[in-house]
Amino acid sequence: MSIRKLKPTSAGRRFQTVSTFEEITRSEPEKSLTEGITSSCGRNCYGRITSRRRGGGNKRLYRIIDFKRDKFGVPAKVFSIEYDPNRSARIALLHYADGEKRYILAPVGIKVGDMITAGDAADIKPGNALQLKKIPVGTLLHNIELNPGRGGQMCRAAGTYAQLVAKEGKYALLRLPSGEVRNVLSTCLATIGQVGNVMHENISIGKAGRNRWLGKRPEVRGVAMNPVDHPLGGGEGKSSGGRHPVTPWGKPTKGYKTRNKKKPSSKLIVKRRGQK
């Protein structure tokens, strides 16, 4: 994938960059692997906003992705590389030898016609899925399970990967994109390689309207609100808020740790992100 800079025919297009989509081989999704998706606009079942700054955006069809990779020993052929509006990564359509079709995240280096499989007997090549205990130390991984059989939960965004650092007993030590180093059960599945669409992080949105297409609404500063709406609101004229920066619910922001210290998975974290 490469990035194309648009001609500055207007102020909104001056700094805008877009993907060239040269890796896409098919424009229409597999109908049997799509379903409707309804936007809640950040509201819960009572109609109250629980996730701010959401709403609008283009309609989408949800592509059903195989994060579990539980079709062991059955070879599959990469039929197409497709765009997915629900995620930053590209997706690959697999045609299995028994006739089944599934979508997976498309890793770097995968192309139409490649053969992919899952299981302990699979080769160490991009797109194949194995248990962590069967993967050599130093390998780059994505779509990693936290619990065996639950499906991949880590490293699914475009360009991300984790590195297998060591294997000790029933655990495998992984270095995650955030810099965190943590233990994961060695019986968990992971997919070989780095997630594709690596240049996604370098795309410049360029204008506010393009974020609205994605369903993202504006973020209003607390000091611009009324006192009833935010702890930093109110005051005559422009004010600084009069206190250290806080969330709308009064908790300190800018560096305040919010992780629960009693979380059971804390004992699996060897080094927290940001630590040297």
UniProtKB/Swiss-Prot annotation:
GO terms for cellular component: large ribosomal subunit. Keywords: Ribonucleoprotein, Ribosomal protein, RNA-binding, rRNA-binding. One of its GO terms (molecular function) is transferase activity. Residues 224-276 are annotated as: Disordered. InterPro entries: NA-bd_OB-fold, Rib_uL2_dom2, Ribosomal_uL2, Ribosomal_uL2_bac/org-type, Ribosomal_uL2_C, Ribosomal_uL2_CS, Ribosomal_uL2_dom3, Ribosomal_uL2_RNA-bd_dom. One of its GO terms (biological process) is cytoplasmic translation. Residues 254-276 have a biased composition (Basic residues). One of the primary rRNA binding proteins. Required for association of the 30S and 50S subunits to form the 70S ribosome, for tRNA binding and peptide bond formation. It has been suggested to have peptidyltransferase activity; this is somewhat controversial. Makes several contacts with the 16S rRNA in the 70S ribosome. Part of the 50S ribosomal subunit. Forms a bridge to the 30S subunit in the 70S ribosome. Belongs to the universal ribosomal protein uL2 family. This is Large ribosomal subunit protein uL2. It comes from Solidesulfovibrio magneticus (strain ATCC 700980 / DSM 13731 / RS-1) (Desulfovibrio magneticus). The lineage of its organism: Bacteria, Pseudomonadati, Thermodesulfobacteriota, Desulfovibrionia, Desulfovibrionales. The gene is rplB.
